[in-house]
Amino acid sequence: MGSDWSVRTLAIVAGRPEGVGQPANVPIVPASALGLGYSREDGTPTWVALEEAVGRLEGGHATAFASGIATVSAVLDLLPAGAEVAVPSDSYVGTRAMFDHAERMGRLRCRRVTPADTGAWVAAAGEADLLWLESPTNPSLELIDIPAITAAAAGRAKVVVDNTFATPLGQQPLSLGADIVVHSATKLIGGHSDLLLGLTVAAEEELAAQLRDARTRGGATPGALEAWLALRGLRTLGVRYAEASRSAALLAERLGKHAAVTRVRYPGSGAMISFELAGPDLADRLCEHLRLIRHATSLGGVESSLERRAARPGDAHVPSGALRFSVGLEDPEDLWLDLAQALDSLD
């Protein structure tokens, strides 16, 4: 396999069967045991192909899990009791819930850091056992200076980066010095809102082995169908990411010019936009007036969706008028017509 191929090409070819007489695509292998080994320990050919592919894209050793949140559990399983973890104050609600629960149970201590405060992250790197980064953050799309933080943490704290929003097409955190990358493949990697699956990618094989052991102990193994669906989604990630990025950039620019919109956050690439209205009532009314864009949770699918995260349990810190917009593959002009009519209805 070409070592100089782009990430977009690798997303299509990595992990596929090789050799005469092999199928063009990886088959679904619904096996609970392979010879003398349980598949929950060693995986199935379907998992292995997905892990090989994502590992190639991220530049490390991948392990598939039953869900994105299961990857958080596996990382926590690596920490001794009483460990200190630095986490962003704005991040995925499920991740924060996991850390909050572990802290309440006395398993670890959490230091909550403002995402863009690089100085605070650098200080934490000298004291914490693990730094959990998310860039862009969910749902506010704040950016974290990964290279500066990994440089400060080198030889001290382990650095984990949730790369769900950026995907390997947008950034490869292991190349920036991170130790572990995690993904909710439920989102952009799968891309069709039809699966639950998570992935870790470790820079070192020893660390990957520890994560695989955590998966086995916790029983957080993915189904064969889910692994196959995630691999199928990965094959089109390049074109989906590029198209969604083009549409999102256009829509972010237009949203920024609309009188009803008070703030727009867009990191320059990717499918996610965060924008704010003057208050929760206006945001709720906008959601009610949408015709094409789905008012729904989750993100990263071929269909566009929008949600007011502050209305959801655990996200009260998010501005009350903020809306998280996942841009899909519909015609961007149709998406804008839908947004514009909903925004205009607020007058």
What are these regions (language model features)?
Residues 1-53:
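N-terminal "arm"/small-domain region of PLP-dependent enzymes with the aminotransferase-like
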Residues 49, 53-57, 63, 70-71:
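Glycine-rich loop-to-alpha-helix module at the N-terminal edge of alpha/beta enzyme cores
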Residues 29-31, 35-37, 248-249, 265-274:
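Conserved glycine-rich beta-strand-loop-beta hairpin in the small C-terminal domain of fold type I
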Residues 267-323, 327, 340-341:
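Conserved C-terminal alpha-helix-loop-beta "cap" of PLP-dependent enzymes
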Residues 14, 30-34, 66, 308-310, ...:
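Pocket-edge structural micro-motifs
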Residues 8, 122, 146, 240, ...:
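PLP-dependent enzyme catalytic core of the Aspartate aminotransferase-like
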Residues 2-3, 13, 17, 62-260, ...:
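Conserved PLP-enzyme active-site core in the AAT-like
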Residues 33-34, 202-207, 234, 276-281:
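Short loop segments at secondary-structure junctions
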